Amino acid sequence: MFDNKNRFVIENYNKQSCFASFLPGISGIHGTPLWNFYVNRGQAICSFGSENKDHSIMEFYPAHQSYQFTKTMGFRTFLKVDGTFYEPFVDDDMPHKMYIGMNELEIEETNEALGIKVNVLYYTMPNERLGGLVRTVTITNLAGAKKDVEVLDGMPALLPYGIALKDMKETAQTTKAWMQVEDVNEKLPYYRVRIALADAAEVSEVEAGNFMVSVNKNGEKLPIIADPELIFDYDTSLTKPVNFYKTEVLALAAEHQLCANQVPAGFACAHEEITDSHTIYSVYGQAGTKELFHTFANAGLDAAYFARKHEENDAIINELADTIATTTADPVFDAYCKQTYIDNVLRGGYPVKLPGGHIFYVYSRKHGDVERDYNFFSMLPEYYSQGNGNFRDVNQNRRSDIYFANFV
């Protein structure tokens, strides 16, 4: 049931009964949170974004549609292993697993015929001025001989900043005319609308943007394809990467891209000779300005940086959960206690003592997710983040605070 990291394990999750969940979106007091929802289908993440549904990076869908669309519209990985095409997490008969941690999610698939294993790890980037979802894709060579591997990894639809949920649900065809991606050739794609989508006489400039950046272990930025037609060609269902079948991936990335007037994609490209393993590190997020994004992306993103951020991510959630650390004869019950406490923190907040004796509650937000699609949740993209909530949610936690945080 649990692995050696105390993560819950689900074997062959694509064949199990549907369920939906979320990463807690806790990025530390001095971090910027994102909301992230996942289901046990495809590559798991079904939607994510900043603040609320009107700031989606991957479009928000309610649960029943997430179960249908995640294999296609969620994250995708296309591989050519010694010339043989393979898309992991699509064939339900291929052995695969899901590992669910308190503040991370990992999926794994093993292809014995090709002699490779693919692991994808997700966690929210902690302690940064901008919010980001970290996605690391590791391809492990299970055979003795070196393998030639081409990789195309990312999202078939990455929404530009400035598009509300209503725009995508009601007028998406019209809204495409505002969409654009900048700086693709610099390997720093910045997704935003040209001008604000407002029926007003005054034109408003949009500074903020959604972004992605992908690097290898040495911190070298990878080429990005933002034009979905360059990958899928005539296949408008986005099922088959038609051009990837017949074109070497780096040559494909070097071709001309149409970066406006369509829903853009976001795929990183790599071509490697793999003896042991190879990892692609990607961050998908939102920044208040392009300058802030460039400062972040050029600050030494390499394997050591992501290892450090992963450790910080674990430390943040464990510090909260240790408040209710329980030791019994049943480790499942002990883990349940920690998870229950984290769930309560998310609903009613975690008390922090400020100078002057003031108490401030961080991390609270209304319990909206893909199943509770009626709730308009909000998580402010700022330090000491908190969100909207119901009075009953706050009161629920105040009863337990007198025991777990007696300074209140």
Predicted regions mapped to residue ranges:
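Anionic coordination/interaction segments
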Residues: M1-V408
